[in-house]
Amino acid sequence: GVWSTVLGGLKKFAKGGLEAIVNPK
């Protein structure tokens, strides 16, 4: 549904943000 898509996007965004903080380029 819509919520699963939204939550999936948020998780993906959060994961990318964490990776950027933990392993900056």
From Swiss-Prot:
GO biological processes: defense response to Gram-negative bacterium; defense response to Gram-positive bacterium; hemolysis in another organism
Tissue specificity as recorded in UniProt: Expressed by the skin glands.
Record key words, sorted: Amphibian defense peptide, Antibiotic, Antimicrobial, Secreted
Record keyword Secreted present: yes
GO cellular component assignments: extracellular region
Localisation: Secreted
Coiled-coil portions: none
Top-rank taxon, per record: Eukaryota
Protein's job: Has very strong antibacterial activity against Gram-positive bacterium S.aureus and very weak activity against Gram-negative bacterium E.coli.
Name this protein carries in UniProt: Antimicrobial peptide 2
Source species of the chain: Xenopus tropicalis (Western clawed frog)
Organism ancestry: Eukaryota, Metazoa, Chordata, Craniata, Vertebrata
